[in-house]
Amino acid sequence: MAKIISYDEEARQGMLEGLDKLANTVKVTLGPKGRNVVLDKTYGAPTITNDGVSIAKEIDLEDPYERIGAELVKEVAKKTDDVAGDGTTTATVLAQSLVHEGLKNVVAGSNPIALRRGIEKATEVIVKELVAAAKDVETKDQIAATATISAADPEVGEKIAEALDKVGQDGVVTVEDNNRFGLDLDFTEGMRFDKGYIAPYFVTNADDQTAVLEDPYILLTSGKVSSQQDIVHVAELVMKTGKPLLIIAEDVDGEALPTLILNNIRGTFKSCAVKAPGFGDRRKAMLQDMAILTGAQVVSDELGLKLESVDTSVLGHAKKVIVSKDETTIVQGAGSKEDIDARVAQIRAEIENTDSDYDREKLQERLAKLAGGVAVIKVGAATEVEAKERKHRIEDAVRNAKAAIEEGLLPGGGVALVQAAAKAEKAEAVTSLTGEEATGAAIVFRAIEAPIKQIAENAGVSGDVVINTVRSLPDGEGFNAATDTYEDLLAAGVTDPVKVTRSALQNAASIAGLFLTTEAVVANKPEPKPAAPAAGADMGY
């Protein structure tokens, strides 16, 4: 495909117009009195939302230079959303403000590289001030307050607080569709995985078609269980104890399966066979998780263990196991707390080190099954459009609440940024800057007022008046746009997670630095649209 190239001011101006088109669309949603944006769809009903990243994703501009500018800001919104689940609009507004302030200086002849260094240094100091000002989340009400602000719905805030209170920080909260109107909250006790019984003959409870094993032994093997002698040895060991047996294996087939089923039907020996979840290395890891949870050892050729020669020491134990057609739940495994804690620490380290979003999600699920639990918020609404929009807001609010637990809370409404910047301006790392680096730092201190101004203007109040008033207030006090009052925002429940505010500023500063140091843009040349056929052409005359 042919390319078009522009340089210097022309390049930056084209990108700036694209950035402004996207940012001006997104920023009307900021704050408690922010407006909605309607997104037209190629098929189906339009979507109505006030979620910054959803709006940004839908914007695709025709002009190639404008498209590149818009894509840069989309990256800010997406990165902030991925890390913290909220703050996308704040990040977009900050990026726009930083770029505008920076370009004024670039046009006036400042060195973009020096400006970028100044922006980075000022951002680093402000982030330190934000972290220092953080307040730990101590109550369920604080979680509810921050989730309520993110989702703009008190009922959602309460459900998320209840879910996280139950499953803990390491637990997983998933959001699913509900067949009926409203919100429902379900909890999973113990470790649950999505594999059910291999054959319905293992069912013990005909009413709900489940196999319930009380105080069972648990055999975990990474291979197939096929021959009769594979199973007879283990079955005889367990039969002597009078307890049931759960077998989790790659598969149970051949002579082994009918042997188990026949003994089950006769009442000679109660058991249930389940396929191991996952594939490949992930299956091995999940089997090892189960082994640690239940105090078992995985029987595998790699370890030199054979089914025909094992004893009860390799079998795990649990208080109860419930197996349905589609899933298995292990309740109160008998593994040692020390081993479980060590495994949890190992999975946490893997989460920190992975670059793959998919791997991180799967590791988080494993962590939840070992350390916390799983809560499911079921969402129902009058229309499919409303349900989809509400579901998305709840997913964001869950990540927002987890971010608050992880790094703490700050006063919301853009106030924390302004107050942290006021302290950062006096820090030696900033006052020691000279020349154009000092100019770069000054750009950050001016641009950082943009979110609070936008929140005020969306609420119908002068942004400049609000900024001047907030500067004179003690730390933690600011403008509550929901009530049009100045008050202690932490006490009023108007809070933002540190992670959200920090990520928004860092991502905005990163993109602004790239924008200012751009000297050329290479874009795809738009393909000419084919001309419409002349009237009367190809009519057979």
UniProtKB/Swiss-Prot annotation:
GO cellular component, one term: cytoplasm
Binding positions (ATP): T29, L30, G31, P32, D86, G87, T88, T89, T90, G413, N480, A481, A482, D496
Domain of life: Bacteria
One Pfam family cited in the UniProt record for this chain: Cpn60_TCP1
Record-linked CDD domains: GroEL
Enzymatic reactions: ATP + H2O + a folded polypeptide = ADP + phosphate + an unfolded polypeptide
UniProt subcellular location: Cytoplasm
Gene Ontology molecular function terms on file: ATP binding; ATP-dependent protein folding chaperone; isomerase activity; unfolded protein binding
InterPro entries: Chaperonin_Cpn60_CS, Cpn60/GroEL, Cpn60/GroEL/TCP-1, GroEL-like_apical_dom_sf, GROEL-like_equatorial_sf, TCP-1-like_intermed_sf
Keywords tagged on the record: ATP-binding, Chaperone, Cytoplasm, Isomerase, Nucleotide-binding
GO biological process terms held by the UniProt record: protein refolding
EC identifiers of the protein: 5.6.1.7
Subunit text: Forms a cylinder of 14 subunits composed of two heptameric rings stacked back-to-back. Interacts with the co-chaperonin GroES.
Function: Together with its co-chaperonin GroES, plays an essential role in assisting protein folding. The GroEL-GroES system forms a nano-cage that allows encapsulation of the non-native substrate proteins and provides a physical environment optimized to promote and accelerate protein folding.
Similarity section: Belongs to the chaperonin (HSP60) family.
Name recorded for this polypeptide: Chaperonin GroEL
Native source organism of the sequence: Bifidobacterium longum subsp. infantis (strain ATCC 15697 / DSM 20088 / JCM 1222 / NCTC 11817 / S12)
Annotated gene: groEL
